[in-house]
Amino acid sequence: MATHSTNEFRGGLKVMVDGDPCSIIDNEFVKPGKGQAFNRVKFRNLKTGRVLERTFKSGETLPAADVVEVEMQYLYNDGEFWHFMTSENYEQHAASKEAVAEAKQWLKEEALCMVTMWNGVPLSVEPPNFVELKITETEPGVRGDTATGGTKRAKLETGAVVRVPLFLNEGEIIKVDTRRGEYVSRAK
């Protein structure tokens, strides 16, 4: 199995720590005036989402995590699991509530997502950067009602709630940035 030395540690590198796959968030090289140099490393556990901080002596190694990012199509939610399919071989995988997390509010059937896999199990799901969703609930925009800054709340078909301009009505399809959860434009 491949290993990574402390001088190869970079943000985003996937390594195994205590038997769990982790992603390095931050790596700081420290050379004290007296004593051996060391690295102070911040990790995110990909299974639990927890952030850990550890120190490693200069030259120590960690095994590489066999983590793969695969583009998959979202199929459906059966109440407990979210089901995804790879486009190449039509293999299906079930992602848990923890793996889907915040992405569930942006998932629409047939959407292409990036799924982080470890040993054949989905660890996390990243929705597309932009999605087109239908407005299912919003107040009617009243002309001249701009005291609130010209936006109103709108509930989308997936259950997500975003702020939209007053001119949008129920039934319209809008483009939303999933990274910030903001309205971008009307869908063309």
From Swiss-Prot:
Gene3D superfamilies: 2.30.30.30, Nucleic acid-binding proteins. The modification N6-(3,6-diaminohexanoyl)-5-hydroxylysine is found at residue 34. May be beta-lysylated on the epsilon-amino group of Lys-34 by the combined action of EpmA and EpmB, and then hydroxylated on the C5 position of the same residue by EpmC (if this protein is present). Lysylation is critical for the stimulatory effect of EF-P on peptide-bond formation. The lysylation moiety may extend toward the peptidyltransferase center and stabilize the terminal 3-CCA end of the tRNA. Hydroxylation of the C5 position on Lys-34 may allow additional potential stabilizing hydrogen-bond interactions with the P-tRNA. One of its GO terms (molecular function) is translation elongation factor activity. Its main location: cytoplasm. Keywords: Cytoplasm, Elongation factor, Hydroxylation, Protein biosynthesis. SMART domains: EFP, Elong-fact-P_C. InterPro entries: Elong-fact-P_C, NA-bd_OB-fold, Rib_uL2_dom2, Transl_elong_fac_P/YeiP, Transl_elong_KOW-like, Transl_elong_P/YeiP_cen, Transl_elong_P/YeiP_CS, Transl_elongation_fac_P. Pathway: Protein biosynthesis; polypeptide chain elongation. One of its GO terms (cellular component) is cytoplasm. Involved in peptide bond synthesis. Alleviates ribosome stalling that occurs when 3 or more consecutive Pro residues or the sequence PPG is present in a protein, possibly by augmenting the peptidyl transferase activity of the ribosome. Modification of Lys-34 is required for alleviation. Belongs to the elongation factor P family. This is Elongation factor P. It comes from Coxiella burnetii (strain RSA 493 / Nine Mile phase I).
